[in-house]
Design a protein with these regions (language model features):
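Juxta-kinase regulatory segment immediately upstream of eukaryotic protein kinase catalytic domains
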Residues: 1-26
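Conserved ATP-binding subdomain of kinase catalytic cores across diverse folds
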Residues: 25-174, 248-250, 261-262, 266-273, ...
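ATP-dependent phospho-/nucleotidyl transfer catalytic cores
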Residues: 27-31, 52-53, 59-63, 118-134, ...
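Conserved active-site aspartate in kinases
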Residues: 241
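Active-site activation/catalytic loop segments of kinase-like enzymes and analogous catalytic loops
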Residues: 251-294, 311-330
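Small/polar glycine-rich anion-binding or flexible loop at a beta-alpha turn
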Residues: 302-312
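Long, compositionally biased intrinsically disordered regions
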Residues: 353-356
Length: 369
């Protein structure tokens, strides 16, 4: 997609019902790497909004994506009102176009959407304290609980087979067989690591197929910075970035949060001796998550959360290594072997999780382990 100029941004902004003319700033807002995000505000500076250009290379059906977002936020708004909450702060509010649509297609066919700006909030880029991590956990658990009765089958799959770990394994095998850049000879230990865990890749989907765990509405990208925290109270109030809300498993959301939050190193740490899975932070997150989501979960589903931590970490490592074999086309790299370092970090975390897996199960399901 072409770069966003101020005139292009203003043209897109003029398509939305902001309640009057708005001013634009062509500087990107936030930490996101997929969509192009900007802040616009009314001419009298009384209100701010988020204006985004959706990345249609990643999300090929923006209209279906916005149907998901509108359906889910409408459902959340009703739940929040019933609980005496403030839906203007506790879920995203979609701004329609002047013609009443949920998104605007510009002259180049690019898709744009707009939200109210949720004021006086912060989002975390890393775990600063146990309290922070528990706050994120409680907010994500509440999000899952509020969507418990949402019909998952009505949602569009915005990224096909996103957390299908066996499919990620199959893609790795194809990349390994092709070995387009001759890199396979450099990664024999990593290849062996993945091959030894082929059966693990099937655990969660096998449990789903057997009816042991339910298909839910899940977020599927539960990074810390996708939870807005009230700047005054420190409480988590709103889950954002709903583009990957799809049918999925609670283990996906739980596991991805553990993968990114329950360790004390960067995702691309080149020194594997510094990589450490923090079982205590895992427990902090698990207790927070289950305090808001656990009432609707069976013993089997609670046990699946521990598997989610293992498999989301393994899956991510497989994706990094696949991209390394294919020439680093998907994940941005800043140095040679960047994706290899990323994969090795994930595999170190998996290995450490395996060593304490009985304890991980005990933490999420103490009554039936």
């Amino acid at each position: 997609m072409k770069s966003v100029t101020l005139s292009l941004l203003q043209s897109a902004a003029n398509a939305f019902d902001f309640g009057g003319p708005v001013l634009c700033d062509a500087h990107h807002y936030g930490e996101g790497h997929i969509n192009d995000t900007f802040v616009v505000w009314r001419e009298d500076h009384s209100k701010r909004f988020i204006l985004q250009r959706i990345n249609t290379d990643t999300f090929t059906n923006p209209v279906g994506l916005m149907e998901n977002v509108c359906g889910v936020t409408r459902h959340l708004r009703a739940k929040i009102l019933a609980e005496g909450g403030d839906p203007a702060r506790e879920t995203l509010s979609v701004i329609p176009t002047l013609s009443g649509s949920t998104c605007y297609l510009d002259a180049d066919g690019a898709a744009w959407r707009a939200y109210d700006f949720v004021e006086d909030t912060i989002c975390l880029q890393q775990v600063g304290s146990e309290t922070d991590f528990r706050t994120v956990a409680e907010t994500l658990g509440k999000f899952q609980n509020q969507l418990e009765d949402y019909p998952a089958s009505t949602l569009h799959e915005t990224i096909a087979r996103f957390h299908d770990t066996p499919n990620r394994y199959a893609n790795f095998e194809k990349a390994l067989a092709a070995d387009a850049l001759g890199r396979a000879k450099n990664i024999a230990p990593e290849i062996e690591f993945i091959h030894a865990r082929e059966q693990d890749c099937h655990v969660l989907l096998d449990q789903l197929a057997a009816g042991e765990i339910p298909l839910r509405v899940t977020h599927n990208d539960t990074k810390l910075n996708n939870v807005l925290i009230d700047a005054a109270t420190g409480k988590g109030i709103c889950v954002i970035d709903l583009d990957t809300v799809m049918p999925g498993l609670s283990a996906y959301d739980f596991g991805d949060s553990i993968r990114t939050g329950a360790n004390d190193c960067a995702e691309d740490e080149p020194d594997q001796s510094k990589v450490h899975f923090d079982l205590h932070l895992y427990e902090v997150f698990a207790k927070g998550y289950l305090s808001t989501a656990g009432a609707s979960m069976s013993m089997a589903e609670k046990k699946s959360l521990a598997w989610g931590a293992r498999l989301m970490t393994l899956e991510c490592g497989i994706r990094f290594l696949t991209d390394y074999l294919e020439g680093d086309h998907y994940f941005h790299i800043a140095r040679p072997d960047h994706n290899l370092d990323r994969a090795r970090t994930q595999f170190t975390l998996v290995r450490q999780m395996e060593e304490v897996f009985d304890q991980m199960l005990e933490i999420v399901c103490p009554d039936n382990h």
